[in-house]
Amino acid sequence: MANVVVIGAQWGDEGKGKITDLLSRSADVVVRYQGGVNAGHTIVVDEKVLKLHLIPSGILYPETICLIGSGTVVDPKVMLKEIKMLKDNDIDISGLQLASTAHVTMPYHCVIDAAMEERRGLKKIGTTGRGIGPTYADKSQRNGIRVIDLLDERKLREALEIPLAEKNELLEKIYGKEAIDKEKIIEEYLEFGRLIKPHVVDCTRIIHKASRNKKNILFEGAQGTLLDLDHGTYPFVTSSNPVSGGACIGAGVGPTLIDRVIGVAKAYTTRVGEGPFPTELKGKINDQLCDRGGEYGTTTGRRRRCGWFDGVIGKYAVEVNGLDCLAITKLDVLDELEEIKVCTSYELNGEKIDYFPSSAEDFGKCTPIFKTLPGWKSSTANCRHLEDLPPPAMAYLRFLAELMEVPIAIVSLGASRDQTIVVEDPIHGPKRALLSS
């Protein structure tokens, strides 16, 4: 038995969906532990492209239990659309389960999210506009609506009474928007409750039962370390905790239940939205990475900002998450480059530093110090073993492993499942990897 957490080691969009899908074949339970529909992952199966925002990647394996945990925020409209899409593609969803205690994103959350971002003007954060922040804010203020409330009209009416009155006053008097009709919401969300009721469970109880029965449990994070509310580039962050510690809170397990933490990182770096990004590229190479990597957000469709691999934030992610190993994705995107740069440290106010500054203002002033490595100018897309890789590609991976001081267990060379080199099975293999320092 092994219980594994999969986290993003950068700013999200690292390819966690593919890695989780790969590991899910060995998992009995897959748990999404935080975030909402602001996250998106793309999975390619039999040339079909499936884009999911809420439902865990493990849903593609019919024997796997897929839990949407208590730490998530759920938009039932999106969940039902994803259920329909999966059914239309003949995918068995009988293993899909939703925590009764997860909070629900309501229509007013989305309206307020967009209005707040509009009001910020030039100081905007770059939110997806999906209502995630306002949903988590209501949760913290104990004004939230939970999944269990959608199953009982009396509970839903009581739960809506105070927050909806407050939100309507805010919408009308501060943002100049129309008030939201209470009866319409109640009717609509009771129907959502009726439709999702077969999937609603006590999430924590199921996880602990699986643990007692020595099952393999995979905890799937959304977004990435540098978007963590407490440990990211605040305020340009998400409203939850994507780091490995968030798995304990969002799934309701103790840290001793976690056996291993896998960090997923691209062979370069991307970021969506606002906020500092020291290794960001402009011009031809940026366009090349964006086009070859298909760097457009699954959730927003926004073009991602691209840059060289940043080893400083990488080492920070190793420390914050307690990473045991890495999965490096999109190595093939670098195939046509003459040379490749890796940030090994920063210069801040004339001083060389090798750590991630806690101030976003200081981080924005950091100038990257690069190590230049030769490119390989040949395709890696069909490589299936380490020895198939061009020597410069192997050298690049070894350099990343040495810089991050953590072994590489998986290398992804494309979107398809078979475009993967598994150096070590992170669930069943020994706690080591062959490609290491």
From Swiss-Prot:
Superkingdom to which the source organism belongs: Bacteria
E.C. no: 6.3.4.4
Assembly and binders: Homodimer.
Protein name (record): Adenylosuccinate synthetase
Gene3D superfamilies: Adenylosuccinate Synthetase, subunit A, domain 1, Adenylosuccinate Synthetase, subunit A, domain 2, Adenylosuccinate Synthetase, subunit A, domain 3
CDD domains (UniProt xref): AdSS
Alphabetical list of InterPro entries matching this protein: Adenylosuccin_syn_GTP-bd, Adenylosuccin_syn_Lys_AS, Adenylosuccinate_synth_dom1, Adenylosuccinate_synth_dom2, Adenylosuccinate_synth_dom3, Adenylosuccinate_synthetase, P-loop_NTPase
The family this protein is said to belong to: Belongs to the adenylosuccinate synthetase family.
Active-site annotation: 13 (proton acceptor), 41 (proton donor)
Job of this protein: Plays an important role in the de novo pathway of purine nucleotide biosynthesis. Catalyzes the first committed step in the biosynthesis of AMP from IMP.
Cofactor remark from the record: Binds 1 Mg(2+) ion per subunit.
Main location: cytoplasm
Catalytic reaction equation(s): IMP + L-aspartate + GTP = N(6)-(1,2-dicarboxyethyl)-AMP + GDP + phosphate + 2 H(+)
Keyword Transport assigned: no
GO biological process: 'de novo' AMP biosynthetic process; IMP metabolic process
Pathway(s) annotated for this protein in UniProt: Purine metabolism; AMP biosynthesis via de novo pathway; AMP from IMP: step 1/2
GO cellular component, one term: cytoplasm
Co-factor(s): Mg(2+)
EC primary class: ligase
Binding site residues for substrate: 298-304
Keyword terms, alphabetized: Cytoplasm, GTP-binding, Ligase, Magnesium, Metal-binding, Nucleotide-binding, Purine biosynthesis
Entry's localization field: Cytoplasm
GO molecular function, one term: GTP binding
Organism listed in the record: Prochlorococcus marinus (strain SARG / CCMP1375 / SS120)
Binding site for IMP: 13-16, 38-41, 128, 142, 223, 238, 302
Binding of Mg(2+), residues: 13, 40
Residues reported to bind GTP: 12-18, 40-42, 304, 330-332, 412-414
